[in-house]
């Protein structure tokens, strides 16, 4: 049969041929096909065809719906519609599933063609359902499409869009549903937008399309975070990306309306927008490193080192509050969660304390999780509303569109790039299979031969990447599941692919760095995959972690408490696959968002019979395989096995979903079409064709090979002969078999050979030929079924959707874990009649505000802060508490409660009460400060008011000479500043020079200013003649300044003489001049002491008296100093009585009582008020000479000496402190001691260097190693900032404990809220060897219950102390113990070999403290010397003294606080603060054994859990070590606490201001509250007034009044600076004595460096004594209050409620040691009887519980033994100090030790075998060089097993053989 290719195009040039296979054979190369495409492109024909199977579309970067003539004919849209028509015809007439697969690079226009195709398909069913399906596609694109460097609409998620049809009733398929399956959204883009690209479009839609009211609600109005006009959003890239030609505002409206038409309620749309806004705000969070200034609410209190804990906090709290409100959580919880991250490391939960960069990444994880879950929820909700039940779906049309091949990843995510390229590789392989291999088997079975066509086969790459089990993605998933490292993954790839697969090359895991001769780990290692589109290098660094895509349990735990139902639904959907704790199924450890869709293609999940399949053997085999696959899929999905979530990472899930796509497309019942989208150029230039660019794409996709294949075999269908003949109306051909008749028909049709072939049982046809015989031309509409089958009756008027009830079908959902309801209810299911749903609900959203009538952001925030509380305790307030509360309300009554709640933002009543208490305490403190200030300044001024008076001698000292204090003069009792007046003297130096004026300085110049008597005095009659004059007194007498005599008239007086008789009379001139002097230049008044006034009257006969503090002199008046003087030229008038103008009674007073204070007489003088007023005016203006000087009066002397007495008393305390510091003599050398001591270190997040220094310093102490026990308590599984391992692992590595030792966690009581009182811990023990010291140790690791996700086990330093205190308390009182305490007892007694009761002392240091080698010895010596000593501390110095200015100012303060304050308190045997960083306590009394430090009262008070008042918070959360000392003084008042300067340690002081401020706030406030606790105690010892109570009171008072003291010093300095004549000598002498005595101390101790430190300390006094106290007092309530609170109950009771649940003490079983020991003894004895091998007798003892449950309940797996040997009988026998009552080897049931476990003995060689081999080795070994270690290594080589567990036996056997004992 001749082959001919029909011309499918019309007449014209070559470009008119749209079908590439129709071109001549010589034009079938890449170059020629590219040229052909170019010729079509240039005439606006951007499409071509590969027969009927595929469309080739070139992106014109213009309107894709316009063809060459302006219509759609010839356009890309027309090509897509043609494919839609073909698919729809095949769907309706053959009931085949249809699939359209898109291929092309990014920017080739796949999304556009896909949209045209979908529109064309949906237009064939113009119903509301089709509209919804179209809108669903728009929603998908909005959520998953972005703008990249190559295209403005780049899809970043694989799409499998399934349109569901019912084809059972008619050849016109009925659209009944749809399904959107998204595959692997590019999540890395959310938090890391590439430069020059955009994030997903919907985020920009939200920002551009919301109204102002909506923006305000969402916090998008730019009012927060920055002060700039345009806010830069981190997650939206560069601001230029907001304006790139995309109409985002319109897009948002369409998006919103699409959701509404898809039946999303308005509230849900608003919630969606809030989540999107939250994601934007998460990008705005700014983090900083700070110090935790307050104890967290669920913490027991205390800090494990000086200062505080370094944490990461959010800077912009306003942004944080917006996010928290929308997520329905509290802002504090959100900040805490972002600052920590919990991981699983070696099967342990570990919380990492993140730095700001880590917190930023954690916030990015939250953003990615929110967006991924939101997309998954929206799509699943759409699917629930649009997807038809599987049983009703007859056929489907699937659109497959995955992102294009990616040569380089813009987001930096190697995983996204790998999975993306894996998908393109798979889809390309599907394409090749469809054209080259799909019909090959059937052609062969039908005995049809087709000429082979060569093509590029990417099967190697597909197998290498996608093969289940050992493909690249499977290996990546397997390595992720096994927690392998990146390098281990690389090695796994090498073993799998090296030399076995040409498509994958594995790079080297090691590399030689420049300048190095050694191979090191290659941090830039890659593996290379040869994809069909080119080679790509994939870095392995971080790939394993990225593939895990772990969402930390912290985020899940936070969201678990959300008050937002919508957020709960997001995190409750199956897309979130959770991993639960193996022992606590309700606890989610971590999770991941699924990388595969929640549904499978209907082809994969439908069990109905697929019609239209040929019944050949091959097809039957395929059908059976598919049905079997369906059954397996259904069974696997129905189980909903949570293990799936544990088994599969992102690559495994994506591989499974890709496999579903592959099987759906290659299903025998599926007909596939392909759309090749090509870019005409790389620069996105419209109408420009780059031949090189296009040829590369044609070559990459193998279009030339496909075209050649179609030229030889273009078969689309296989029709059995009967069906074929029935369709061709071949009844007229009556002769021949079916085959012959078919051949005759084909010959008659003259179809080309490549489109039709006759096989053994049927005919292979192209789609064109089939359409011809089926009479399906362009205008053909066939209503019936082909093949003569009767059509169903569809005349009932109902669509299939209407004729059946659609329920929620979830059979096809992929399992999402076994806890779908953890975060809320499942999403609503169900779908109702598709075409009858009203769309009237789609309307405007609240008039431009979709949040109208919904909760405001403030309401959301308030709801997020609410906690679900449960009653846990009931109690009554103590009377003292009631009295205090009454006082608080009395002091703060004027502050209304609502003001505190609203303005202070304190919704909780207990927090408001604490704030009131703080205010009340501050008021009391300031009252005391005011009293102190009053006594220092106000009291002397009140008793002796300050007088501005000058005696004659003082005035004379102001003579203006060099060295004098100034130039003052006196005028009628008033002292004037001459220096100030001279510059303003009129008429200036022209008349009287300045020197002349200065000659008057220091003198009384009253004579210079003659007075007009009549102008200054009205006399007794109301008028005095103007001629009356009064001479001025000459006061030039002994002891007085040189004054001008009245008779020696000064020549300058004439310038001031304006009396009546002069020619220039000015009566008021003197008054006016004096007014100016008094108000401008007045410095004071002349002062005359009462004694001196009497002397003047007695010795000089002055008529001088004192009236109300004023001194008057009437001597001249009485001695005739008055006369009349008329104007020149006029006679002197004779006026009787003119010079007698004063009342006789007044004159008589001066005569009879001169020298006396006549105030009383003056008050009783018999004058009318008018006359008395006149007389007083005359006295003041004419006879006043000064004030009474009382500065040396008795009253003033009392005020001075009263203050001096107080100063002396305080100075005496200073002297005692000085003497106390001196009384310590030199250091004596202590003797060797035999007391047992526990050395405890509480560890939290310290670095390895600090921990090692602390541990080594304790181990190297000069004290018998076997009598000290090193106890390290690790407070939780936490990785501190800067650490690479959790703190417990660091400690265990230092101590040499192998990672293989993993004891069972055991329960014990902790200090926490509610259920957090139940904690679990692990016990490790062993020997630590350092510098010749071998010290037994025990490590207690608090790991927390399985239900604890964040910071597991962490309860605070006080709880760490209580672990040991409670244990020792129960040991000494023989009380029942918890499982962990029993294990501690066992480890100490049977492993370490010392009875716990033997330990007498507890030595406690911090993890950053280093102790001197003799410190423990000196402290224990003091305990032995004084049996009444209960506790002591030593001197603590700084190791980082020169670290910063902050540390420098603390050096001297540390030194004097010990050597003065503590030394002084030690005199009385009551040191009020024993620092937790360096103290030793007496556990029990030496004589009686009575518990002291661990007595019931102290343990009970110190373990207080209910810390709900301000006082208790300050006691237990700020100064737990000081409170512990307070309890010792309170309950053991007969015992002493001392300070030993000979014991020394060094610690690290805060080196930053924030940490220093935090530390001092805690110290100052705890000091105030602890001293307040001590003052009421009646048992405080002491003698006379120097009792301990007095010392405590002085300490408390000095702490409180520090700010006033500083202010007083400033006041003194000001006084000296402003008035040099007044120097408070006493005050400065005291200040000098304070520091002088301190200097004496460090000089005597030869601490010369303290001179410099003292100067720095003095400079910092304002900080220490003023700034810090003020800050501390006001921040007294600065706490994280947790969620436990107190509410009022009935009958005056208080109810404690907590969100941590109620703790049941019975949940922790307890046993006495004797009972526990008896059980162990019985079990051990039985085991020893049954076990032949005594070496492992400890094994069955340790695993005596045969059932599935632990001895202590809880349903956990039986524990495994942790250790079976103690210190070893040969080498460590000296350690067996206490008799062991355990038979056999010492073994731990639960604890871990560094020796070996019975598990390690399984499979070990026997001792006899080892001994024989050792003999053999020693026979040939060089005995001069052989070592035990070498023998052990040789034995391990021979037996091929590690022999660490047999080390002790090997060593002892070797010694025995060498010594001849064996």
UniProtKB/Swiss-Prot annotation:
Q: What is this protein called?
A: Chitin synthase V
SUPFAM superfamilies attached to this UniProt entry: Cytochrome b5-like heme/steroid binding domain, DEK C-terminal domain, Nucleotide-diphospho-sugar transferases, P-loop containing nucleoside triphosphate hydrolases
Q: Which GO terms describe its molecular function?
A: actin binding; ATP binding; chitin synthase activity; cytoskeletal motor activity
Which residues, renumbered to this chain, are glycosylated?
Answer: 63, 123, 429, 483, 522, 560, 1036, 1063, 1192, 1459, 1565, 1771
Transmembrane region positions?
884-904, 923-943, 1202-1222, 1590-1610, 1623-1643, 1650-1670
User: Where in this chain does the record put each Myosin motor domain?
Assistant: 1-778
A GO cellular component annotation here is: myosin complex
Q: Where is the DEK-C domain?
A: 1804-1859
So where does ATP get bound?
Answer: 104-111
- Annotated region (Actin-binding), positions in chain: 658-682
In what residue span(s) does the Cytochrome b5 heme-binding domain sit?
A: 947-1009
| Enzyme category, top tier | transferase
Which transformation does this protein catalyse, written as a reaction?
[(1->4)-N-acetyl-beta-D-glucosaminyl](n) + UDP-N-acetyl-alpha-D-glucosamine = [(1->4)-N-acetyl-beta-D-glucosaminyl](n+1) + UDP + H(+)
Q: Which Pfam families match?
A: Chitin_synth_2 (PF03142), Cyt-b5 (PF00173), DEK_C (PF08766), Myosin_head (PF00063)
What's its membrane topology? Multi-pass membrane protein
Mind listing the GO biological process terms from this record? chitin biosynthetic process; fungal-type cell wall organization
Q: Which UniProt keywords apply?
A: Actin-binding, ATP-binding, Cell membrane, Glycoprotein, Glycosyltransferase, Membrane, Motor protein, Myosin, Nucleotide-binding, Transferase, Transmembrane, Transmembrane helix, Virulence
